[in-house]
Amino acid sequence: MTNQQDYTQDNDKLYRYLFQNRAVRGEWVRLNKTFTDTLNTHHYPKAVQDLLGEMMVATNLLTATLKFDGNITVQIQGDGPLRLALVNGNDQQQIRALARVDGNITENMSLHNMIGKGVLVITIAPKEGERYQGVISLDKPTITECLEDYFVRSEQLHTQLIIRTGEYEGKPVAAGMLLQIMPDGSGTPEDFEHLTTLAATVKDEELFGLPAEELLYRLYHEETVNLYPAQDVQFFCGCSAERSSSALLLISDEEIDEILAEHKGSIDMQCECCGTHYFFNKEAIEKLKSTKL
């Protein structure tokens, strides 16, 4: 077993790698503090925590495939007790997530029972250029399987996703791997099938507890794998007092006055992602109102 100092060197890291003789590329990511920071200010049911972890890993792996600066939003909306699950990540591997629950969700509740009638929406937003949005049917047992199907349909590329969530040494962890045949057409289905068969043997404790290099060696010790430098992954909400102020400016003066009257002369705005509170008293509100003039 790898000791703690060894495995933690790759906590909250994303690696890209390439099989030299197979024309197949891969990615690996593990979320430790990033996942904990996401959950810290919320009391999500266990099934929702696991789903968010799965979606976060998927989003990290998806953003690593971008050939441009931008971000990807992976969002589930439904009419079940889980009304919304949303993850947003960018090409810098900054990620945030939130969920809205309205009803009882048991620990082992299935994806379909949590969501009810719903869809999975992926929005790709380049910093320059047009946004792209894909709507995916939730007709598979897991988000991972739905996303694999999305890759096949949208990019027509053989793709394997392996994503696991759980605990390691008493702390929440989510990790995953992506394998994809190269889009230049040089890879063969046989090569891809060979590598995915090996990847499918990975154990949870290996994904959660091994450094990337050792994990890849265990899975592919007979292959030549080029492992590229890691990219740091971190929770990043992006909220600020300025953004909260801008949101207040969209509300009519009459409605703001009603809110102030109901809440003893101050407005408390709380970020859904990180839980930060932004307080605005009457003086601050009047100053904001003056900027509308």
Predicted segments, located by residue:
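Interaction interfaces in information-processing and related assembly proteins
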Residues: 2-229
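Cys/His-clustered metal-coordination modules, chiefly Zn-binding fingers
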Residues: 199-293
